[in-house]
């Protein structure tokens, strides 16, 4: 496995759960983009970076199992959002850090993930979160698994927003420019089509 020794080993969580409301109820991770399922694009990117690849999913378990070392499912069938997947994965992570990615950002690249890990070396006790311009991207982050209990307590108190759950831990920003194309979120059919056309030019 080609993981630079200077960077902390990490477990990686791919978030593929959810209702897929903007996709007409389809399982977003399995929707094809440029001839491959979205989850396959993220698998190809992250597989060389970890020996603990976790996927959070609520359906099509057999298909997702092909891409993961571990699968996690929400303990609630109501699709309570990405924080549900994060809280389920943190106690199972085999490394001290959990790197989190949604399944609908296929343009994210290895330098971005490596930059997150480098920032984690600088600030080992705090979550690292991508900040695009003035906007936080809480689903592109690294979380020390030591904070699992804090996030669980936030969940039990009724919090469902990953950003608000992480706020008390004073996340450190990995600052990116507004409009960074790597952060394109392909969460509607129109966006999928538009990005595909632009990439083909």
UniProtKB/Swiss-Prot annotation:
Binding site for GTP: 15-17, 28, 74, 104
EC number(s) reported in the record: 2.7.7.77
Protein name as it appears in the record: Molybdenum cofactor guanylyltransferase
InterPro entries listed in its UniProt record: MobA-like_NTP_Trfase (IPR025877), Molybde_CF_guanTrfase (IPR013482), Nucleotide-diphossugar_trans (IPR029044)
Names of required cofactors: Mg(2+)
Broad class of the protein's primary localization: cytoplasm
Domain writeup: The N-terminal domain determines nucleotide recognition and specific binding, while the C-terminal domain determines the specific binding to the target protein.
Name of the coding gene: mobA
Record keyword Magnesium present: yes
UniProt family annotation: Belongs to the MobA family.
Top EC class of this enzyme: transferase
Residue ranges of the TM segments: none
Superkingdom of origin: Bacteria
GO molecular function annotations of the record: GTP binding; metal ion binding; molybdenum cofactor guanylyltransferase activity
Biological processes per GO annotation: bis(molybdopterin guanine dinucleotide)molybdenum biosynthetic process
SUPFAM superfamilies: Nucleotide-diphospho-sugar transferases
Keywords: Cytoplasm, GTP-binding, Magnesium, Metal-binding, Molybdenum cofactor biosynthesis, Nucleotide-binding, Transferase
Oligomeric and partner information: Monomer.
CDD domains the UniProt entry points to: MobA (cd02503)
Protein task: Transfers a GMP moiety from GTP to Mo-molybdopterin (Mo-MPT) cofactor (Moco or molybdenum cofactor) to form Mo-molybdopterin guanine dinucleotide (Mo-MGD) cofactor.
Binding positions (Mg(2+)): 104
């Amino acid at each position: 496995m080609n993981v630079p020794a200077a960077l902390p080993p990490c477990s990686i969580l791919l978030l593929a759960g959810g209702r897929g409301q903007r996709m007409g109820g389809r399982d977003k991770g399995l929707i094809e983009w440029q001839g491959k399922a979205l989850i396959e694009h993220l698998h190809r990117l992250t597989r060389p970076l970890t020996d603990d690849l976790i996927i959070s999913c609520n359906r099509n378990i057999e298909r997702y199992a092909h891409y993961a070392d571990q699968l996690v499912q929400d303990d609630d069938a109501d699709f309570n959002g990405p924080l549900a997947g994060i809280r389920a994965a943190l106690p199972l992570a085999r490394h001290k850090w959990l790197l989190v990615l949604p399944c609908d950002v296929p343009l994210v690249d290895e330098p971005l993930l490596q930059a997150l890990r480098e920032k984690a070396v600088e600030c080992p006790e705090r979550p690292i979160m991508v900040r695009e311009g003035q906007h936080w991207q809480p689903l592109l982050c690294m979380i020390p698994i030591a904070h699992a209990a804090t996030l669980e307590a936030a969940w039990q108190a009724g919090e469902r927003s990953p950003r608000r759950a992480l706020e008390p831990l004073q996340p450190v920003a990995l600052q990116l420019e507004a409009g960074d194309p790597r952060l394109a979120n392909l969460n509607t059919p129109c966006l999928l089509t538009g990005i595909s056309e632009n990439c083909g030019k």
